Amino acid sequence: MNNNKQPKQGNFVKNILMWVILAIVVVVGFNFFFSSNQSSVDKISYSQLMTKLDGNKIENVTMQPSDSLITVTGEYKEPVKVKGTNNFPLLGNSSSEVKNFQAYIIPTDSVVKDIQNAAKSNDVKLSVVQASSSGMWVQILSYIIPMLLFVGIFWLMMGGMGARGGGGGGNPMSFGKSRAKQQDGKTSKVRFADVAGSEEEKQELVEVVDFLKNPKKYHDLGARIPAGVLLEGPPGTGKTLLAKAVAGEAGVPFYSISGSDFVEMFVGVGASRVRDLFENAKKTAPSIIFIDEIDAVGRQRGAGLGGGNDEREQTLNQLLVEMDGFQDDGNSVIVIAATNRSDVLDPALLRPGRFDRKVLVGAPDVKGREAVLKVHAKNKPLASDVDLHNVATQTPGYVGADLENVLNEAALVAARQNKKEINAADIDEGMDRAMAGPAKKDRIQSMREREIVAYHEAGHAIVGLVLENGSTVRKVTVVPRGRIGGYMLALPDEEIMQPTNFHLQDQLASLMGGRLGEEIVFGVATPGASNDIEKATHIARSMVTEYGMSKKLGMVSYEGDHQVFIGRDYGQTKTYSEATAVMIDDEVRRILGEAYDRAKEAIETHREQHKAIAEALLKYETLDAKQIMSLFKTGKMPDEAAAAEVPEPKTFEESLKDANANVDDFSNINIYNGDEKTDSKPEENKEKSEDETAE
């Protein structure tokens, strides 16, 4: 898409340069014409004229009254050299031989008589012509015509820019025009079938589609379709895709624009663009206006420090006016907006009559994730061992964009190994890469560091296996990825929407298992548990201040109002005293201390299993759920896994050789090796579940 735009932008720049060069050439030529005519005449003063007459150097003289002066022209008997000047210093001055002269004198009787006497005494032919007013106009035109030419060329240039750049894109003279991209709904290929994992959300939008197709049915019943639909939810859940599907199903014009496109540095531009957008939508009604990231323009007015009457607020005011009652005579314009920050939107924007319907587009459940995976796997050849349902169960909290990224990473891994199909191992690697980044198998680690990491992860696994409300341990690995040295993936047997206090307490104990695995075996503590401590502290504080799970403090909310604007809570006092703050800290420490003791008891009671899992991690690097359970119960690996060996990490040259093994001509092929060097910028650890622990 970008490649298609580059030639247009190149031609656009070339056209501008052509117009500028043409304007300069015309102005320069016009001035050169006048200056060349003027430079062919020797301009002299009255005293010089009298000297040349007395010196018998003049052939003839002509006197012509002009305004308040008399123009004296004539010819020399012999050409004289004069230094010419032009209006463009860069061209420099030049000298030339001229035969004509010109002088301006004051029309007094004495001056005229002196010239006549000098001409008569030297036999110089003297003639007088009638006064002419054309000289003044020629001089005026010499200044006006170049200016008019320049303005005309500039106007044509601006018109060409407007024709190519559209209403608000390339034309500087139309800042107030909307930058919305219009798409014909009849040619849109996106349908509700392309949106998976959002069945309830699609059902909410079916009425909007039906109204756009059959408005009479609703008008006859006196029903009013929602003037606006607000799609809110985390990034990557498919809000924009849902809006496109509505336009595709309804078959009406679709105007899409980002909230940031309304506001510019010039005053009044945002409000003007809002008016222009709705005027265009009304002309093609019924139609849909989609505003992506509406929080960029719809934030609360007067919020935070310096929240005065700025340009963004003027744009919001105009948007509020346009959205209030523009459905008349069946010509409906429906506004669909998307945001992941609905908490910062202005209340006037959310009231009934503007955004009547609010659709929460959240992360899909296991059934929805499986449906999303099936949609994204349509164009990917999957091997027979790939179970998309199993992949869906291992990706809680993943949204549509994350799931698409997992399959894409798996396809890249398979392509790197010259496979024809994507197998389960590729999917597993794709999940690891999407969550924690590429593996760093050739990272230099001492044996002691590897042992500490292995016992750390084994500690997480043991606590998760022992506790009743703990999640099922699905995977443990000590392969470094990004900034982490390893991780343990624990998932619940079924998705829990409302975890109990027992679930949270067991989760805290599982988070403590990593640090205890280091302390019990080696008697040391490493920074690898910093992420565990951070998450555990957040959960414990939420239990005390938000969930009311502390018997000492009771069911009281202490930190429920989190302001998002700078300065909004400045000067506001806390709703609890200093003594209560001390009690909150004491309760958080107590809950974390109890979790620490429970985790310590679980590991010390199962020291043999802890050691068996850690040694298996040092040997095999990665263990799945079946292997972990076998080690916990029998202390041994399953038979089919006992013979497996950990492959040595390949060098970049070896990977390049394998990738090019079946390629005849690879001179223009770039091979990407995701596991090549440890000094590459590590990817951030992507936390997908409260039960995942990463160090």
Curated annotation (Swiss-Prot):
Topology class, membrane: Multi-pass membrane protein
Cofactor section: Zn(2+)
Cofactor binding, per record: Binds 1 zinc ion per subunit.
SUPFAM superfamilies according to UniProt: FtsH protease domain-like, P-loop containing nucleoside triphosphate hydrolases
Extracellular side: 37-139
Compartments (UniProt record): Cell membrane
UniProt-listed SMART domains: AAA
Span list, region Disordered: 657-695
Binding site for Zn(2+): 456, 460, 532
Keyword list, A-Z: ATP-binding, Cell membrane, Hydrolase, Membrane, Metal-binding, Metalloprotease, Nucleotide-binding, Protease, Transmembrane, Transmembrane helix, Zinc
InterPro entries: AAA+_ATPase (IPR003593), AAA_lid_3 (IPR041569), ATP-dep_Zn_Metalloprotease (IPR050928), ATPase_AAA_core (IPR003959), ATPase_AAA_CS (IPR003960), FtsH (IPR005936), P-loop_NTPase (IPR027417), Pept_M41_FtsH_extracell (IPR011546)
Record GO biological process: protein catabolic process; proteolysis
Segments crossing the lipid bilayer: 16-36, 140-160
Active-site annotation: 457
Enzyme Commission number(s) of this protein: 3.4.24.-
Pfam families per UniProt: AAA, AAA_lid_3, FtsH_ext, Peptidase_M41
Keyword flag Transmembrane helix: yes
Residues engaged in binding ATP: 233-240
GO-annotated molecular function: ATP binding; ATP hydrolysis activity; ATP-dependent peptidase activity; metalloendopeptidase activity; zinc ion binding
Presence of keyword Amino-acid biosynthesis: no
Sequence ranges of Basic and acidic residues compositional bias: 674-695
Subunit structure: Homohexamer.
UniProt function note: Acts as a processive, ATP-dependent zinc metallopeptidase for both cytoplasmic and membrane proteins. Plays a role in the quality control of integral membrane proteins.
Homology family: In the central section; belongs to the AAA ATPase family.
The protein's name in its UniProt record: ATP-dependent zinc metalloprotease FtsH
Taxonomic lineage of the native organism: Bacteria, Bacillati, Bacillota, Bacilli, Lactobacillales
